[in-house]
């Protein structure tokens, strides 16, 4: 074999060997990075609600699936319906894979209320996946003057919420608009726990509670029928709530696309993302760890014991939904804003 040919062949062998070894090298690099590190699960809510429930389960099970087995801690950064936490992760937060956001539907804030201090672009986050679709319901205390949808037309009912940029405000507002209802919708209750306490005390009659919040933190309320669930806000009825209609079912024809837009965003209320600057090999490792965790029998058993659901989507499916929402027409966005009381 001529010298040049032998040299070319040797170079090709070296290149193939390097390619074959690169995943192992990258994996070792990721393991070296995470070994002895602390990874923070960032939440845009205070302690005590459904996000806190999920975060504690992930903190317990996710570390063993991340190379290097880092410690996981939980950080609460409530405010503006998750926007403050989203801004932090996108900008000043570390871009090395040591901080991960358990997101609200921050994509809605970007599309529907970009002037409310939004400094991130959802499509530039590294989406790890979604672990469920947040199942908001409209729940009323058993002593409240509300037993049917018709009772919400009388103008004497008070519904509480986190903030105008949050689902807890937007869903009741859209329900009121789509069905021609008349009730007072107020803000100022920043967590699920504060809304539940206000409802129990009679300060408010009800709120758009997530099913996970109720069944996870107040299971006795469900068992003892302390709350009345009138409606749920999903594309399809949740299997645990077969007799509770969705707003999409009840919406008139001229509101269907508006309600469907909001309903399609519910998976992002249970998303996991990293900042846009995290190295690709660490993003890949976190995605692999996420999928291993949500398939892990021990994780699923803990979720079952704590009465939270897991219906996960991988990063590719999640990203396809992101693109669909950020690509919605200006006309549809304007009508959605009007329906949720956030028109400019």
Predicted segments with their positions:
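An extracytoplasmic/periplasmic, membrane-proximal ligand-sensing/linker region
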Residues: 35-37, 223-225, 249-250, 257, ...
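Sec/Tat signal peptide C-region and signal peptidase I cleavage site
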Residues: 22-26
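N-terminal secretory signal peptides that target proteins for export/translocation
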Residues: 1-5
């Amino acid at each position: 074999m001529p010298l040049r040919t032998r040299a070319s062949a040797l170079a090709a062998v070296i290149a193939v060997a390097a390619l074959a070894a690169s995943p192992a090298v990258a994996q070792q690099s990721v393991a070296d990075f995470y070994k002895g590190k602390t990874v923070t699960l960032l939440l845009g809510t205070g302690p005590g609600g459904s996000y806190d429930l999920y975060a504690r389960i992930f903190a317990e099970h996710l570390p063993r699936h991340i190379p290097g087995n880092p410690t996981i801690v939980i950080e609460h950064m409530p405010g503006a319906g998750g926007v403050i936490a989203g801004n932090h992760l996108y900008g000043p937060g570390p871009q090395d894979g040591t901080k991960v956001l358990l997101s609200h539907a921050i994509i809605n804030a970007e599309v529907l209320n970009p002037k409310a201090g939004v400094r991130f672009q959802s499509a530039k986050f590294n989406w790890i996946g979604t672990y469920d679709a947040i199942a908001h319901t409209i729940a009323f205390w058993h002593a409240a003057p509300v037993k049917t949808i018709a009772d919400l037309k009388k103008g004497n009912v008070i519904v509480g919420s986190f903030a105008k940029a949050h689902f807890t405000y937007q869903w009741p507002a859209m329900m009121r608009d789509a069905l021609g209802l008349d009730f007072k919708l107020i803000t100022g209750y920043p967590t699920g726990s504060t809304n539940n306490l206000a409802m129990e005390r009679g300060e408010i009659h009800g709120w758009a509670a997530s099913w996970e919040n109720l069944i996870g933190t107040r299971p006795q309320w469900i068992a003892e029928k302390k709350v009345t669930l009138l409606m749920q806000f999903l594309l399809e009825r949740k299997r645990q709530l077969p007799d509770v209609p969705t707003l999409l079912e009840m919406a008139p024809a001229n509101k269907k696309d508006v309600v469907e837009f909001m309903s399609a965003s519910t998976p992002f209320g249970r998303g996991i993302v990293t900042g846009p600057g995290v190295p690709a090999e660490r993003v890949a490792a976190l995605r692999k760890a996420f999928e291993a965790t949500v398939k892990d029998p021990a994780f699923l058993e803990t979720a079952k014991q704590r009465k939270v659901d897991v219906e996960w989507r991988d990063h590719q499916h999640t990203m396809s939904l992101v693109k669909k929402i950020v690509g919605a027409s200006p006309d549809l966005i304007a009508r959605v804003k009007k329906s949720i009381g956030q028109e400019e």
